[in-house]
């Protein structure tokens, strides 16, 4: 008699995940062997951390407003999208230009984003969350999966006490594959804002891009590249208090040039020489995102990869100050 050999295969491991597999050795004759394939999900008893995986199928197929894939973080329990409560607006120097999430009751500033194991920061002043001036986290096609880990995680994570969001970029395969797309949204089908006048303010958003991946050398050297562009012209509904027409007409000649700097009244009089002026100044946003990745399979057990990611963006947000020259 001897111990029967045990073998388990088909146990997937995702980013930031560990599993403990217990095998029971039994006495048997030398000609008996037990093999188990495609085992069901194993309960994680090796750590006490709370985690949630968002896989490639969810990232690619679930609808997203603006193609900002970090919105899918809210699929996990204990996550609240805190973006609407932040101060400032898109294109301004606020606490963060990307989306913000309160996870397990902690502040959004406590979270840490990792891209392929490296800290992933954005364009904000304090670099809390990734993202450009559009307020989106672009690169949906470039992401294979991401995992959100919170609460009593291991010492392999650190720097911030909040959730750790680990993002893994997509890689090439032995077959060439690619995609091209454009999402268009404009004001033709939009409703008029309560403060708008007879015409609907301009709103045009173009989300476009392409990706391609495949083999450089089959089974050995693979590549993947992705580009995504974002263009938005948004008419902001602006209500300003200005001198009324009667005040302009009664002003002395030396004051007339100063009053000319204010918008012309096009709303009702409020009394005391003040009236309302409605306008729709245009906000312009441009963002370009790109990433490339090369994988080299050194051996069945060793993999080397290199990835490069760039996000370049600008925003021109008009102000309500009548003396400003920005448009």
Map each language-model feature to its residues.
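Periplasm-facing N-terminal accessory domains of Gram-negative outer-membrane beta-barrel systems
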Residues: 1-55, 301
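Acidic, glycine-rich flexible loop segments
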Residues: 32, 40-166, 170-327
């Amino acid at each position: 008699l001897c111990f029967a050999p045990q073998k388990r295969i088909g146990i997937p491991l995702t980013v930031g995940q560990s599993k403990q597999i217990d095998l029971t050795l039994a006495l048997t004759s030398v000609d008996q062997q037990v093999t188990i394939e495609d085992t069901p999900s194993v309960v994680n008893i090796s750590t006490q951390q709370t985690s949630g995986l968002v896989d490639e199928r969810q990232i690619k197929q679930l609808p997203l407003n603006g193609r900002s894939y970090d919105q899918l973080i809210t699929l996990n329990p204990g996550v609240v999208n805190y973006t609407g409560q932040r101060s400032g607006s898109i294109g301004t120097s606020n606490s963060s230009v990307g989306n913000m999430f309160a996870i397990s009751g902690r502040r959004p500033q406590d979270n840490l984003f990792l891209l392929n194991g490296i800290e992933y920061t954005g364009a904000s002043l304090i670099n809390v969350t990734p993202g450009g001036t559009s307020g989106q986290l672009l690169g949906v096609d470039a992401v294979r999966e991401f995992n959100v880990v919170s609460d009593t995680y291991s010492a392999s994570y650190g720097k911030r006490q909040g959730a750790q969001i680990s993002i893994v970029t997509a890689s090439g395969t032995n077959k060439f594959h690619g995609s091209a797309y454009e999402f268009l949204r404009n004001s033709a089908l939009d409703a008029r804002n309560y403060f708008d006048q007879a015409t609907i303010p301009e709103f045009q958003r173009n989300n476009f891009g392409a990706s391609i991946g495949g083999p450089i050398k089959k089974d050995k050297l693979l590549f993947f590249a992705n580009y995504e562009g974002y263009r938005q012209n948004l008419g902001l509904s602006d209500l300003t208090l200005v001198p009324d027409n009667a005040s302009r007409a009664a002003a002395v000649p030396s004051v007339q040039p100063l009053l000319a700097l204010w918008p012309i009244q096009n709303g009702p009089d409020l009394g005391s020489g003040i009236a309302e002026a409605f306008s729709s100044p245009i906000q312009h946003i441009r963002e370009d995102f790109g990433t490339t990745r090369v994988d080299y399979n050194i051996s069945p057990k060793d993999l080397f990869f290199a990835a490069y990611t760039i996000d370049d963006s600008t925003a021109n947000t008009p102000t309500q100050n009548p003396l400003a020259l920005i448009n």
